[in-house]
Amino acid sequence: MRYGFTSLLALGLVAAAPAGAQAAGVTVSYNLDVGPLTVTEVKFTVSVAGGQAHGKARIRSAGMSRVFSEFGATAVGEARLGEASPEPVIYTITRDESDMRKVTTVRWDGGPPSYDPPLKKSDRKERLDAAIANGVVDPFTAVLRMGMAGDSPCPSTHQVFDGREVFELALFDKGAGKLDGDAAWKGAVQKCEVRWTPVAGRAKDKGVPGDSYDVAFAPVAELDDGRKLWLPVEMSGKLKGLGFRGFVTKVSD
């Protein structure tokens, strides 16, 4: 679950330019704090042009967490934009932990996505293939669909596939609010509860229970066609019993 959650957070916890700006390109840095420690740092770049959206997130362990596990990852996503919901094209994640590197790629070209490398366990692969046949998107496209849903990203439901796990993200409306803390985004937000539920893959097979998180979305940018782009600017909840908070620390064009 660690990477599944972190990759989604990395591709989603993005504050772009001030509201009303055109979403051409932006780089964002943020921290994920668990308890009193910053355990993960992320640098994220997103660009929107010519009917295509591209996102890249670099994730690495930070602070005392590096003593126990040297973890880093790069996630890259591409999606097609149009009048309907964004459609996934390709999603690649490269994970580095200690002296091991793993690369997983998912491609969409009509019908269910293909993924490489394949799963080794035949029974798990069978269940995973059945789940992705019902229609899934990658984490980057899921965030875009939340962000381009209209007047608010919630309520909505998304089936997400990162190449190894299929999980459901269900968003529920918790009303309007305002941020004025230490995050880079300050101002009005839409509060949502996000429920994460494993559908197929290792987490599902091992009986990992679902989780829920509080997320603050803001209309941080405006697309060329005038649509607002709602993106998460803060998240909080619990991971394995420890409280966490994700927040933007720096925004640059």
Residue ranges and their predicted role:
Residues M1-G4:
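Positively charged n-region of N-terminal signal peptides that target proteins for export
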Residues T6-A16:
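Bacterial N-terminal signal peptides
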Residues S7, A133, A142, V215-A218:
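A generic signature of intrinsically disordered, low-complexity regions enriched in glycine/proline
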Residues A10-L11, I132, D225:
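Residue-level detector of alpha-helical transmembrane segments in integral membrane proteins
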Residues Q22-G110, G150-D253:
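Acidic, serine/threonine-rich low-complexity disordered tracts
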Residues D109-L171:
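Active-site/ligand-binding surface loops and adjacent short beta/alpha elements
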